[in-house]
C-alpha cells in the first residue's frame, strides 16, 4: 500500500515506523481520498426510453447506455468543478432506482505517522487470526487543500483540510 510505496531500503518506514515532527516533514502519499458530497436521484434520466417489456439482456444493455449518457450529462453540469469530482451512478432495488453519488476528490494526501511493525508483531505469532489478537496496525494521513479548502495537487503552500464537521 501507501506505506510500502514510501519505504526505501535506506528508509524502511514499514519496518521502522515514521512520525512527522511537523507538517513540513509529512510525506506525500500516492493516492486520493473522495468525500461523498451529494446524492442525486437520476432514475428518471436513466430509465427514460427504456421499454418495460424488454428481455433482460436487452434491458441491461439499454440501461448501461443510459447510465453512461446520464453520467456524462451530470459531470458536464458540474462545469469547472468537474475536475474535482468523481461521479458514480449505482443501481438500487433491482434496477428500479438509480442514484448519482458525487465524490469530491482530494489529491494532496500526506503520511503523518505509522508505528513500526514490531509494535504489532511480537511473541512469535504474527498472523493470529483468532482472538485475542493484539496488533497495532494503523497509519495516520492528513488531507491537504488549497487556501479556499478545495482539492488541489500537491503544493507545499496547501493547508490542512478543514472539515465542516468533526468529533468534539
Task: Tell me what each language-model feature is.
Residues 1-168:
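Terminal presequence/propeptide segments associated with secretion/organelle targeting
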Amino acid at each position: 500500500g501507501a506505506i510500502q510505496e514510501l519505504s526505501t531500503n535506506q528508509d524502511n518506514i514499514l519496518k521502522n515506523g515514521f512520525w512527522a515532527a511537523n507538517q513540513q516533514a509529512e510525506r506525500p502519499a500516492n493516492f486520493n481520498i473522495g468525500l461523498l458530497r451529494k446524492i442525486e436521484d437520476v432514475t428518471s434520466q436513466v430509465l427514460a426510453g427504456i421499454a418495460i417489456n424488454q428481455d433482460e439482456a436487452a434491458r441491461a444493455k439499454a440501461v448501461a447506455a443510459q447510465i453512461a449518457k446520464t453520467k456524462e450529462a451530470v459531470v458536464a453540469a458540474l462545469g469547472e468543478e468537474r475536475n474535482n469530482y468523481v461521479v458514480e451512478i449505482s443501481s438500487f432495488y433491482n434496477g428500479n432506482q438509480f442514484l448519482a453519488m458525487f465524490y469530491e476528490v482530494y489529491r494532496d494526501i500526506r503520511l503523518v505517522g505509522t508505528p513500526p511493525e514490531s509494535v504489532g508483531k511480537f511473541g512469535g505469532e504474527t498472523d493470529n487470526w483468532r482472538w485475542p489478537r493484539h496488533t497495532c496496525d494503523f497509519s495516520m494521513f492528513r488531507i491537504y487543500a488549497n487556501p479556499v479548502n478545495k482539492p488541489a495537487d500537491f503544493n507545499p503552500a496547501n493547508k490542512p483540510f478543514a472539515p465542516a464537521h468533526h468529533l468534539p
